[in-house]
């Protein structure tokens, strides 16, 4: 997994036309991808433990997880236009949201727009300041730990013998 992430980010960096020495976003992007991948692996483990090997049910659950991530991930529907329950509660568990927002902040934030200008991309996503990047990293780490602990708890519950 790590080798694939390193290769993916290196290829993207090579074809971006901006060398890493000036952009300085290679290793932070690797960190974002590793945290996002580890968190999504935890979600997959929880889903596979819950459906107990039923492939059709796992496919339906996977599609539901995908659509929920697409809705709450600030991809197609802007979060600031949604109801506060979706925006403030459910979107905190969207791994895609925090991965996207952190990578967008690396690309367009941190003073890249000079002279008091505001990036149109960050404005449309309602990202106000650069400190949101660290919030995204913290939430990715929290989601990773939460999903891994949930998978471990479910696995422990499933394999533990029932005492009657």
Task: Name each model-derived stretch.
Residues 1-164:
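Membrane-spanning alpha-helical segments of multipass transporters and channels
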């Amino acid at each position: 997994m790590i080798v694939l992430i390193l290769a993916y980010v290196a290829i993207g960096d090579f074809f971006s036309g901006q060398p890493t020495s000036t952009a300085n976003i290679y290793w932070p992007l690797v960190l974002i991808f590793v945290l996002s991948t580890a968190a999504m692996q935890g979600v997959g483990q929880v889903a596979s433990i819950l459906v107990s090997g039923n492939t059709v049910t796992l496919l339906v659950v996977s599609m539901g997880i995908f659509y929920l991530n697409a809705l709450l991930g600030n991809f197609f529907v802007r979060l600031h236009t949604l109801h506060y329950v979706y925006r403030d509660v459910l979107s905190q568990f969207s791994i895609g949201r925090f991965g996207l927002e952190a990578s967008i902040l690396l690309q367009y934030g941190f003073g890249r727009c000079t002279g008091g200008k505001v990036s149109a991309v960050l404005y449309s996503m309602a990202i106000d300041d650069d400190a949101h990047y660290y919030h995204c990293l913290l939430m990715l780490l929290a989601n990773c730990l939460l999903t891994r602990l949930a998978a471990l708890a479910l696995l422990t519950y499933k394999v533990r013998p029932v005492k009657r």
